[in-house]
Amino acid sequence: MTAVLNGKQVLAPPKDIAEVKNAFEIYERLDELDPYSVDDLLTAHDIMTRGLVEKSGVFRSRPEGVVDNEGNVLHFGTPPQYVPDLVMELLDWAKTSEIHMLIRSCVFHYELELIHPFADGNGRVCRLWHTLLLSQWNPAFAWLPVESIIHDRQQEYYAAINVSNDAGESTVFIEFMLSAIKASLMDAISMSDKMSDEKMDKATLRWKKIEEYLKTHDYIMNADVRGVVGNGESNSCPISN
């Protein structure tokens, strides 16, 4: 992905490259989007599917079904004439509901997927909007997008949607998403702790070297520090023993 964004030549289908660029653009503009605006939802779809589908940024006008990799129809989306009103109702519910945002965002994700408002790109928009809702509640989620959370759990993700569809309610999907979010948060915390430990280890090592130097010297100057710690860093003033 980095190579694509840096303009380097990448051996990949043009569609894949376009998806990466489109995704980067919309996630860069995440804080500009109103999570309860129909217009912003359509704008997001327009950006994410630009150059990839015939009609971007508009609700579908034909019946659509959700199919699996083998072409089996999993469920049919809402009849197109009802899509705009249902999407507006769902956005209003997300704005006014008193359910905790962690659960509310999961319900929104599932219900928008069920409505299936677009001819293509529904999953990407659902996951983006899930991220947007969470990031409005806690900005940390802007750095932990739902798209990344489910990246390695896609089979479980689609299975949870299918089971919930069969059951006629979203409990299984909500439980899966909350579990995936928790796991990703724990991984992020673990990585942060590891980086902090590594940084602390380097700082401790520098001070140990300085302490050893001061055992045989009365003081240490900035120039001496650079030579002692061996990494080009120095203190702003002399350190005396």
Q: What function would you assign to each model-found segment?
A:
Residues 1-241:
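FIC/Doc superfamily catalytic core
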